Swiss-Prot record:
Residue list for modification Phosphoserine: 416
Extra remark beyond the main annotation: Retrotransposons are mobile genetic entities that are able to replicate via an RNA intermediate and a reverse transcription step. In contrast to retroviruses, retrotransposons are non-infectious, lack an envelope and remain intracellular. Ty1 retrotransposons belong to the copia elements (pseudoviridae).
Example of a GO cellular component annotation carried by this entry: cytoplasm
Protein name: Transposon Ty1-LR4 Gag polyprotein
Gene that this sequence comes from: TY1A-LR4
Length: 440
């Protein structure tokens, strides 16, 4: 009976024998191909014996395969694990280097470690085509990349751009603390600008210059998670990623707003420390400027109390406002409002005195006009003195003539002389000359 079954299924007998040998050798930790010569001969004898006993079967009959057939194969060895991350989380070389990826200075040699909070977002395959943008290596943070539209460059120019980008683009450092995130995001933004992605960075109004593509969003997400591990992100960044783990643009927009706020705080502190006021501007404008600065600093967590604010304000006062330093420095509980009351009082007094000065000047001008008209009226008087001088000269000549005629008549002349000696002599002495007695 057994010989008849063996004759009908000769391959099953051979396979079972080999399977038993293989299983026995695997359990003894021996190479399945390393079989002794005696065992090989026994196996061959059993197969020839079975072949000699089998009956002739029709050629058209098909022998069914045994699904439990085990061929002698070496045991499979699992591939070694590379690093602490499992192989299913590691990106392949083709996925890390899609077409055009190196144009952006992508660090393809670094494995992508996914966030624990979100599934892995793999970059697109090599079938996607990248738009090429002009190189803007080394641009400052405030300078956006020029928008190039949807134009494509030829392969030769793209290759030259790729080599130049690889040469100059430097990746950002690794984030190691949540407190270092404001400084780190500045270097990351500069890395994007140097990688010709300045157009996708949000501007002051929170909107980018151009629309970001899917490939650029993938690059943005992958580079962000490489250089900013999730355990070192601030709380507000984790809150954004918990809603949408790919919304890196919102993180950049919020970071830029915080940068501007920090810059405004620094400018307000410098302005408050260098206040100067001498009454050249209205007191209302000066008060509004100072109070707005103090309110902004208080809202941003930098509290300025009344004592410090008054000291900073009084230190910048000059001119007539300077004495407020000495009249108010003894009041410890003085407020900013009380100090500005004194400043307003001095300013109003200055304005009142300045308004009265134009009337005084106008009176002086009137007096000058009157003096000018008076000098004009004196000019005819000067001219009227000439006939008076001529009359005086005529009288002098007439007197001289009388004296000469009196010499001819001695009697009358003596009387005239005696009369003239008794009469006072009036001299037109312009230089205030005085004659000594006895000289005439």
């Amino acid at each position: 009976m057994e010989s008849q079954q063996l004759s009908q299924h000769p391959h099953i007998s051979h396979g079972s024998a080999c399977a038993s040998v293989t299983s026995k050798e695997v359990h003894t930790n021996q190479d399945p191909l390393d079989v002794s010569a005696s065992k090989t001969e026994e196996c061959e004898k059993a197969s020839t014996k079975a072949n000699s006993q089998q009956t002739t079967t029709p050629a058209s009959s098909a022998v069914p395969e045994n699904p439990h057939h085990a061929s002698p194969q070496p045991a499979s060895v699992p591939p070694p694990q590379n690093g602490p991350y499992p192989q299913q989380c590691m990106m392949t070389q083709n996925q890390a280097n899609p077409s055009g990826w190196s144009f952006y200075g992508h660090p393809s040699m670094i494995p992508y470690t996914p966030y624990q909070m979100s599934p892995m977002y793999f970059p697109p395959g090599p079938q996607s085509q990248f738009p090429q943008y002009p190189s803007s290596v080394g641009t400052p943070l405030s300078t956006p990349s020029p928008e190039s539209g949807n134009t494509f460059t030829d392969s030769s120019s793209a290759d030259s751009d790729m080599t130049s980008t690889k040469k100059y683009v430097r990746p950002p450092p690794m984030l190691t603390s949540p407190n270092d995130f404001p400084n780190w995001v500045k270097t990351y933004i500069k890395f994007l600008q140097n990688s010709n992605l300045g157009g996708i960075i949000p501007t002051v109004n929170g909107k980018p210059v151009r629309q970001i593509t899917d490939d650029e969003l993938t690059f943005l997400y992958n580079t962000f998670q490489i250089f900013a591990p999730s355990q070192f992100l601030p709380t507000w960044v984790k809150d954004i990623l918990s809603v949408d783990y790919t919304d890196i643009m919102k993180i950049l927009s919020k970071s830029i707003e915080k940068m501007q706020s920090d810059t405004q705080e620094a400018n307000d502190i410098v302005t408050l420390a260098n206040l100067q006021y001498n009454g050249s501007t209205p007191a209302d404008a000066f008060e509004t400027k100072v109070t707005n600065i103090i309110d902004r600093l208080n809202n941003n967590g930098i509290h300025i109390n009344n004592k410090v604010a008054c000291q900073l304000i009084m230190r910048g006062l000059s001119g007539e406002y300077k004495f407020l330093r000495y009249t108010r420095h003894r009041h410890l509980n003085m407020t900013v409002a009380e100090l500005f009351l004194d400043i307003h009082a001095i300013y109003e007094e200055q304005q009142g005195s300045r308004n009265s000065k134009p009337n005084y000047r106008r009176n002086l001008s009137d007096e000058k006009n009157d003096s000018r008209s008076y000098t004009n009226t004196t000019k005819p008087k000067v001219i009227a003195r000439n006939p008076q001088k001529t009359n005086n000269s005529k009288s002098k000549t007439a007197r001289a003539h009388n004296v000469s005629t009196s010499n001819n008549s001695p009697s009358t002349d003596n009387d005239s002389i005696s009369k003239s000696t008794t009469e006072p002599i009036q001299l037109n002495n312009k230089h205030d000359l005085h004659l000594r007695p006895g000289t005439y």
